[in-house]
Amino acid sequence: MLLIPAIDLKDGHCVRLKQGDMDQSTIFSEDPAAMARNWVDKGARRLHLVDLNGAFAGKPKNEAAIKRILAEVGSEIDVQLGGGIRDLDTIERYLDAGLRYVIIGTAAVKNPGFLQDACTAFGGHIIVGLDAKDGRVATDGWSKLTGHEVVDLAKKFQDYGVESIIYTDIGRDGMLSGINIQATVKLAQALTIPVIASGGLSNMADIDALCAVEDEGVQGVICGRSIYSGDLDFEAAQERADELNG
């Protein structure tokens, strides 16, 4: 089970938002590369970066900070990035800089042809991030709810050749209310590619619950607010996950 620390970037800083609200952000570090080093030193095997400004602007906005993170830890662990990735040139630039995976969210839903092209050009490097509320997919930094069912869309993207799906329950993100295990497992069971859980991880009980469903296709979990607030000790959580699932 991969426990994947999130580094959310806003104006070059590492922050956390409350339910995707750019006006409700808490700065946790003004040096994201040092934060990346911190998580790697505590046993992280992958990092999850989000360009928050980019997600809202539709183009990269924190590229300098991202490249500093890649220079610091990119040769040691896999790094994945989402937010503002809307064209193949951006993907190529980030992969050349040392990124392992690019996460396509809104653009995959709105422009499936772009996702197909990305999977063809950069097979093995494309992850789709699906954000959902009550089983329906949301786009544009969670501001718009679509009519798409998560499972149906994920199956289509699986056929395109995406590497995995990051599933975020946006009713829970940043609220420390527990991962929506049921919805995550339902999605994982419908697919043959891995699912990474996101949104609401709060304590060791969540780690235990996720490890219990790893065999259903749940590969890992994004760790956000809980590891920054101290509600969850990342190092201890990763050790527990390794003990449970080896």
Swiss-Prot record:
Q: Which residues form the active site?
A: D8 (proton acceptor), D131 (proton donor)
Biological process (GO) annotations held by this record are: L-histidine biosynthetic process; L-tryptophan biosynthetic process
GO cellular component, alphabetical, reads: cytoplasm
Copy the pathway line from the protein's UniProt record: Amino-acid biosynthesis; L-histidine biosynthesis; L-histidine from 5-phospho-alpha-D-ribose 1-diphosphate: step 4/9
Report which reactions are catalysed by this protein: 1-(5-phospho-beta-D-ribosyl)-5-[(5-phospho-beta-D-ribosylamino)methylideneamino]imidazole-4-carboxamide = 5-[(5-phospho-1-deoxy-D-ribulos-1-ylimino)methylamino]-1-(5-phospho-beta-D-ribosyl)imidazole-4-carboxamide
Q: Which UniProt keywords apply?
A: Amino-acid biosynthesis, Cytoplasm, Histidine biosynthesis, Isomerase
> Which Pfam families does UniProt cross-reference here?
His_biosynth
Where mainly found? cytoplasm
EC numbers: 5.3.1.16
Q: Which InterPro entries match?
A: Aldolase_TIM, His_biosynth, HisA_bact_arch, Isoase_HisA-like, Isoase_HisA-like_bact, RibuloseP-bd_barrel
Q: What class of enzyme is it?
A: isomerase
Q: Which GO terms describe its molecular function?
A: 1-(5-phosphoribosyl)-5-[(5-phosphoribosylamino)methylideneamino]imidazole-4-carboxamide isomerase activity
Q: Where in the cell is it found?
A: Cytoplasm
PANTHER family, per the entry = 1-(5-PHOSPHORIBOSYL)-5-[(5-PHOSPHORIBOSYLAMINO)METHYLIDENEAMINO] IMIDAZOLE-4-CARBOXAMIDE ISOMERASE
Q: Give the similarity note.
A: Belongs to the HisA/HisF family.
Q: What is this protein called?
A: 1-(5-phosphoribosyl)-5-[(5-phosphoribosylamino)methylideneamino] imidazole-4-carboxamide isomerase
Species of provenance: Polaromonas naphthalenivorans (strain CJ2)
